């Protein structure tokens, strides 16, 4: 077997008692990745929104849920429900032919990305892994990422800590049940990437759609930046600057001002990458590059004050290439027409 092009995490070398590669029931992300050429390439995937399928969906990926035969896919969007409240009964309709199958779309994005002529050294999933909280959904996803043979790290989004109860009811009559995030989702976790450092922060709030970093995370962040001798990139879910869409900006990071005050004294922070907004953007603020990334499923139309799906934007993912000289290159790739 040919040697891997980069150092691998303990997750890759962990062997069970029977001599077989152990499945990541409690996977251990790496604390450090090094490459011979000094470049670390990160594949960012976000907003997968996996959930247990309904009989109407056509993608069939079998797993067990409470000993019942189930399938995994994603949210099914109705063409007639592309405007209005994203949580309305019309906007999420399981009785129509699905337009987007989120599991199939995620799988197509992952397969396409790993077939590109780009060496992938780390996969980062920035939240909203699921749309309904079940351990089996996470386990299925972790096993799929594990099968890639590439180190991976996942953080929580709002859907990973909040279950929406009464989806058949009007939005204002529904309740939001808080949950603790899956134990394998990272928070206040750092990883050395050659001459870079990536910090993983949980911005999700159980029972809420908006984000909040919180005092503990901000203090941890200030300590990491104060003691870092490397350029730093942060991975989190919620956006830190308005997207100029009223409906999504109602669910921004609530303590974004405190975040910017916390990082202002430090020059180490170079970039923040996240999801939540289901669209691609690149901006700069206080000398920091901010990247939002398309969902691997459905997209939101930019610049709309009311919830609007983007008919023309395809699912996608982001590459981040961290160079040994402290520079960063990043680009978005969309799913090809013949993929998935």
Swiss-Prot record:
Its EC number is 3.1.4.-. AMP binds at residues 49, 128, 158-159, 278. One of its GO terms (molecular function) is nucleotide binding. Binds 2 Fe(2+) ions per subunit. The keyword Iron-sulfur does not apply. Keywords: Hydrolase, Iron, Metal-binding, Nucleotide-binding. Its cofactor is Fe(2+). Belongs to the cyclic nucleotide phosphodiesterase class-III family. PANTHER family: CYCLIC NUCLEOTIDE PHOSPHODIESTERASE CBUA0032-RELATED, PHOSPHOHYDROLASE. This is Probable cyclic nucleotide phosphodiesterase PsycPRwf_0181.
């Amino acid at each position: 077997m040919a040697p891997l092009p980069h150092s691998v995490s303990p997750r890759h070398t962990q062997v069970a008692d029977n001599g077989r590669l152990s499945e990541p029931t409690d996977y251990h992300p790496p604390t450090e990745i090094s490459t011979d050429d000094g470049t670390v390439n990160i594949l960012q995937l976000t907003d997968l929104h996996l959930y247990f399928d309904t009989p109407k969906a056509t993608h069939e990926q079998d797993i067990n849920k409470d000993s019942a035969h189930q399938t995994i896919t994603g949210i099914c969007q109705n063409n007639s429900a592309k405007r209005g409240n994203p949580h309305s009964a019309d906007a999420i309709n399981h009785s129509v032919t699905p337009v987007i199958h989120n599991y199939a779309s995620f799988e197509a994005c992952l397969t396409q990305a790993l077939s590109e002529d780009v060496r992938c050294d780390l996969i980062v999933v920035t939240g909203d892994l699921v749309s309904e909280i079940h351990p089996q959904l996470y386990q299925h996803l972790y096993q799929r990422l594990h099968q890639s043979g590439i180190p991976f790290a996942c953080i929580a989004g709002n859907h990973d800590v909040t279950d929406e109860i009464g989806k058949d009811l009007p939005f204002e009559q529904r309740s939001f049940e808080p949950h603790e995030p899956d134990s394998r989702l990272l928070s206040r976790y750092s990883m050395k990437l050659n001459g870079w450092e990536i910090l993983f922060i949980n911005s999700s709030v159980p029972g809420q759609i908006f984000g909040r970093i919180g005092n503990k995370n901000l203090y941890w962040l200030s300590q990491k930046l104060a003691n870092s001798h490397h350029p730093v990139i942060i991975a989190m879910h919620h956006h830190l600057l308005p997207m100029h869409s009223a409906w999504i900006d109602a669910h921004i990071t609530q303590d974004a001002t405190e975040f910017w005050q916390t990082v202002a004294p430090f020059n180490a922070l170079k970039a923040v990458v996240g999801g939540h907004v289901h669209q691609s953007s690149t901006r700069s603020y206080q000398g920091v590059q901010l990247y939002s990334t398309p969902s691997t499923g459905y997209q939101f139309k930019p610049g709309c004050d009311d919830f609007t799906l983007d008919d023309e934007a395809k699912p996608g993912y982001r590459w981040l290439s961290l160079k040994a000289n402290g520079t960063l290159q990043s680009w978005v790739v969309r799913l090809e027409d013949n993929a998935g």
